[in-house]
Amino acid sequence: MITPAQLSRLHIDPALADPLNATFIKFKIDTDRKQAAFLGQCGHECGNFKIFEENLNYRAATLMKLWPKRFPTLEIANQYAGNPKKIANMVYANRMGNRDEASGDGYRFRGRGAIQLTGHSGYYHAGQALGVDFVADPDLVATPLYALMTAGWFWSTHGCNELADAMNWVGLTKKINGGTIGLDDRVAHTALALNVFDGSSALA
């Protein structure tokens, strides 16, 4: 069981101890290594458990860098820059179970939670697993309990426990991020958490 004191040492809100422990129990995140990896990966995704909703307030140049196929010119990017709702509805349209841009699904099911659950399909399947209708009330995913529970659901269904046990940090990061963005930071936070848990930081 993780304690509020341990979370304080990791600069994580101690009030998250109970929902974290509930998540760890439900999804069998049951060793120091697994728990440290969960904190390291999710901490990178959500500002060390401080930000449970995706920030989509991007400038035109950033849009062109992040989604070059969707924003091939500055003229197109300028039509969306600084408008998070319009950006989400465009970049997340017709994927991840979302309908077209006009439906509003992109913004409705934008990234939320400790692992940035995104898209209608993710909200639906996480809700089915947890017995909560996240499709009807997507904002629930940004509340502390469900921010962590949905992350635990994703972690469990994507084989992250096994990757953490194997200390496959690259593979684990790819499962969560789709690439290796922030790999060094994720590994560093995992090592820090492991040190707090058992006095070790050995990740290999």
What are these regions (language model features)?
Residues C42-E45, A164-G182:
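Acidic helix/loop microenvironments that form the catalytic cleft of cell-wall polysaccharide enzymes
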Residues I2-A15, P19, G43-W153:
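Peptidoglycan-targeting cell-wall enzymes and recognition modules
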Residues M1, T31-G40, A166-L172:
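Alpha-helical scaffolds flanking conserved acidic
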Residues L10-A37:
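N-terminal carbohydrate-binding/catalytic regions of secreted carbohydrate-active enzymes
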Residues K175-A204:
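Low-complexity, Gly/Ser/Thr/Pro-rich intrinsically disordered linker/tail segments
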Residues N21, L39-C42, A151-G152, T173, ...:
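Non-transmembrane alpha-helical segments in soluble domains
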